[in-house]
From Swiss-Prot:
Binding locations of [4Fe-4S] cluster: C117, C121, C124
PANTHER family named among the record's database cross-references: 23S RRNA METHYLTRANSFERASE, RADICAL SAM CORE DOMAIN-CONTAINING PROTEIN
Region (Disordered): 350-372
HAMAP family recorded: RNA_methyltr_RlmN
Native organism: Anaeromyxobacter dehalogenans (strain 2CP-C)
Family to which this protein belongs: Belongs to the radical SAM superfamily. RlmN family.
Annotated cofactor note: Binds 1 [4Fe-4S] cluster. The cluster is coordinated with 3 cysteines and an exchangeable S-adenosyl-L-methionine.
Residues of the active site: E97, C345
InterPro entries, alphabetized: Aldolase_TIM, Methyltransferase_A, RlmN_N, RNA_MTrfase_RlmN, rRNA_lsu_MTrfase_RlmN/Cfr, rSAM
Disulfide bond among keywords: yes
EC number in record: 2.1.1.192
Cofactors that this protein relies on: [4Fe-4S] cluster
Protein name: Dual-specificity RNA methyltransferase RlmN
Keywords carried by this UniProt record: 4Fe-4S, Cytoplasm, Disulfide bond, Iron, Iron-sulfur, Metal-binding, Methyltransferase, rRNA processing, S-adenosyl-L-methionine, Transferase, tRNA processing
């Protein structure tokens, strides 16, 4: 489901070596390609006109034969806790969201990789959208560039790169758009570009097992797995991808995931009241993760109207964490951020709304009647 049927090269989407080849083909010296690349990916230029030290003749030739992806900021919402959610409009009018999460020691951007999502997790608002299309590499990296520039305007940091960390946990399943993701990662990690550290970039997956090993072999970024259940029956009901790649297969892929010594896989566990938050779930989770260098992020469910799930009862998350810690599993409770602007985990949905199949699934799990 790739985007626009347009063969015009997008400068923002080109790997560094392909950009160099394109500019060499115009008869230019190699240093010109580096100049253009740094304007695109270090300074986040929104147009060719901004590239003031690039000869006008070259800019005009590039304008004739290429295009330059630049997202338009459609909305900006600021939370009381400092979180900012941006909705970006693409060239074909699609909307995607990214979220800025400021902390004392880091400034993180949660990045989207698709318009919508085909995975269909029943507790997630993005899943109600379905999948419209994949994002191009330039549309992925430009979320970072637009965010960096906006943060400088807001006085949230100094240029050219206030952001310190990236998490690919926004709209979409990153590994389902691996071609674009890999190019985007290379651009974002490049020394002539933003030069993010591998240690500060995390890619999340719902469990697309065949692509997980490829990610580990071809990059050194960190892996997060959206687990959310401790039995196949439970996970089948809330995450349909489990019917293709059940828990045993997923966890085997985690054990085999290529990692540098000292690294850990983060397991995201969204806690749904009355569904997956019982003491027995904590005990099963500890057993499942045995032998895997793991850290568990416990995420109290952010309630979404119409989806039918509820947050855990008071104290349930802390008790769950304590049970894991007692079984030698590193576990932390992730603080919900941006809930007042629908920017928290599972709340991103730039288009669409709740669907009946998700309400029915929630009702089946919780024993409550489905609305509608």
């Amino acid at each position: 489901m790739d985007v626009l049927h347009d063969d015009t090269p997008d400068l923002r989407s080109l790997p560094q070596e392909r950009l160099a080849s394109l500019i060499a083909g115009l008869g230019e010296k190699p240093f010109r390609a580096r100049q253009v690349y740094r304007w695109l990916h270090l300074r986040g230029a929104a147009s060719l006109e901004e590239m003031t030290d690039v000869p006008r003749a070259l800019r005009e030739r590039l304008a004739e034969g290429t295009r330059l992806t630049t997202l338009e900021r459609a909305t900006e919402q600021r939370s009381a806790d400092g979180t900012i959610k941006w909705t970006w409009r693409t060239r074909d009018g699609k909307l995607v969201e990214s979220v800025y999460l400021p902390e004392t020691d880091r400034k993180t951007l949660c990045v989207s990789t698709q318009v919508g999502c085909a995975v269909g997790c029943t507790f997630c608002m993005t899943g109600t959208m379905g999948l419209a299309r994949n994002l191009e590499p330039g549309e992925i990296v430009d979320q970072v560039h637009r965010a960096n520039r906006r943060l400088i305007e807001l006085g949230e940091g100094e240029g050219p790169r206030p952001l310190t960390n990236l998490v690919f946990m926004g709209m979409g399943e990153p590994l389902a758009n691996y071609r674009s993701l890999k190019v985007a990662l290379d651009l974002l990690l490049s020394e002539d570009g933003p030069n993010f550290s591998h240690r500060h970039v995390t890619v999340s997956t719902s469990g697309l097992v065949p692509v997980m090993r490829r990610l580990g072999e071809e990059t050194q970024v960190k892996l997060a797995v959206s687990l959310n259940a401790t039995t196949d029956a439970q996970r089948d009901a809330i995450m349909p991808i489990n019917r293709r790649y059940p828990l045993a297969e997923l966890l085997r892929a985690c054990r085999e995931f290529p990692m540098k010594q000292g690294r850990r896989i983060t397991f995201e566990y969204v806690m749904l009241g009355g569904v997956n938050d019982a003491p027995e779930d904590a005990e099963r989770l500890a057993r499942l993760l045995r032998g895997i260098p793991a850290k568990v992020n416990l995420i109290p469910y952010n309630e979404n109207p119409g989806l039918g799930f509820a947050a855990p009862a008071p104290g349930a998350v802390e008790r769950f964490r304590d049970l894991l810690v007692a079984r030698n599993v590193t576990a932390v409770v992730r603080k919900n951020r941006g809930t007042d602007i629908a920017a928290a985990c599972g709340q991103l949905a730039a288009e669409g709304g709740p669907g009946d199949p998700r309400r029915r699934a929630a009702a089946a799990l919780t024993g409550t009647p489905a609305a509608g």
